[in-house]
Amino acid sequence: MSKIIGIDLGTTNSAVAVLEGTESKIIANPEGNRTTPSVVSFKNGEIIVGDAAKRQAVTNPETVISIKSKMGTSEKVSANGKEYTPQEISAMILQYLKGYAEDYLGEKVEKAVITVPAYFNDAQRQATKDAGKIAGLEVERIVNEPTAAALAYGMDKTDKDEKILVFDLGGGTFDVSILELGDGVFDVLATAGDNKLGGDDFDQKIIDFLVAEFKKENGIDLSQDKMALQRLKDAAEKAKKDLSGVTQTQISLPFITAGSAGPLHLEMSLSRAKFDDLTRDLVERTKTPVRQALSDAGLSLSEIDEVILVGGSTRIPAVVEAVKAETGKEPNKSVNPDEVVAMGAAIQGGVITGDVKDVVLLDVTPLSLGIETMGGVFTKLIDRNTTIPTSKSQVFSTAADNQPAVDIHVLQGERPMAADNKTLGRFQLTDIPAAPRGIPQIEVTFDIDKNGIVSVKAKDLGTQKEQHIVIKSNDGLSEEEIDRMMKDAEANAEADAKRKEEVDLKNEVDQAIFATEKTIKETEGKGFDTERDAAQSALDELKAAQESGNLDDMKAKLEALNEKAQALAVKMYEQAAAAQQAAQGAEGAQANDSANNDDVVDGEFTEK
């Protein structure tokens, strides 16, 4: 069976891992980094992903960041003269991760386990699955991020019974899960969280502070300047990271904008104490989900054996202190918070292929599921923190005499009224025989699969007629749309590879022309006429090929120029080496003269 890769598709950074033997290994990206920025940019029709995309975010307005926060919504992003769904942008990130995983493994990768925040609802999970499909991946399992982290932490502790609390504060989401580990069973007891809390919010607090201070000083609102705002974002992220290690950092952004008197610069120092003050409310918000999860699990703090920190934002000292204060425990630092989720996903991939034995993962649904009943009430069929996969049925009836159909309004959430919860979908059961209200028996069955994705069935027990749907939110993609996007992604992958090859060649040509012109200039009048003329001739031919835009011709002429330029460089090197040797010889002779002069003795002369 081919390898199943594990992917942590994060808000700010993503990672990919694979199981090698019994070890889960993070695969480094082409730049040698173990995590990849979840950033996509478009330039001259080319799709750029990861580190290169993040580097040009300041100067390129066609850059998309934090797309994960839009998953499961109908929001689209405009770039490259097109409108893209969050699933398509996420698919570009997944495609990039898949590509360098294939390069590392030396084989095609077609299957993946992808992680999502535990508090993702059905629409967000479905959107993640669709993104995988568009990227050419069969998503074998959607796993909750804290659960994946627990898998990676507990893999070598399967002989030990433990209750652990996973505190996962990422770039855009926050989850807390409580698990029981024992005999290879990873049983999620409860999960809670906040889908709108993460490292991005901590960055935003710094940005708001810098904008306010600059406005106070200069009367200019930097938040209205797109390019200045992107520079502020980069500076805020860097300052936040710096303050995890030092107590004060300097933020320096020269030429941030211009005033009536000329260019203006932003120079400010930020202390850790000030940062803690700015973000105090965010740290406070992490406490409620911790208490909620403990309450749902029916556990007291004294029953928790270990606290595991996951996500880059758990490096913030105030967050670590809050976790200690809230749990009364020193967090376990045996796992890398940036990598552990992808590693756990790869382990789950190994469980599916059978490479990892005697491990059972029992996850839960994070939110209650049910339907709208008379008076707009939300009637729960499946409570939150129910172990999945699961199925639950309940019998309902009609609200009016001779009612021919019932509308099934499927919802997810915890509020008592339907209007306050998230709509997952609606469907109708029709052709109900005429009968007084309360007589027809309508059985509604909810099924949640191992990925946390919901399907609902309504059945008239009198006629045995039934209606069945897999929930697709209003913001979800149809099969046709997914197929079209898959084809686009495949076509783009080929076109992108070709375009990248072209860009690389053109850059190489530019570099070779610049370097050769410099060498020819430097060797003027130094007696290498034959080599200089040959290099000049090859240079002119390459320039002509560059002008024509013929790639094959450019490739051939580039090789020819490299050969001639190399010959000229060798001559230069030989001359330089000879000159150095001659200089060393002269120094030696001078040293000998100096040594001979040492025999002369100074004496005093006295007049008589």
UniProtKB/Swiss-Prot annotation:
Induction: By stress conditions e.g. heat shock. Residues 578-598 have a biased composition (Low complexity). Keywords: ATP-binding, Chaperone, Nucleotide-binding, Phosphoprotein, Stress response. Disulfide bonds: none annotated. PROSITE patterns: HSP70_1, HSP70_2, HSP70_3. Residues 599-608 have a biased composition (Acidic residues). The keyword ATP-binding applies. It comes from the Bacteria. Residues 578-608 are annotated as: Disordered. Belongs to the heat shock protein 70 family. PANTHER family: HEAT SHOCK PROTEIN 70KDA. This is Chaperone protein DnaK. It comes from Streptococcus pyogenes serotype M1.
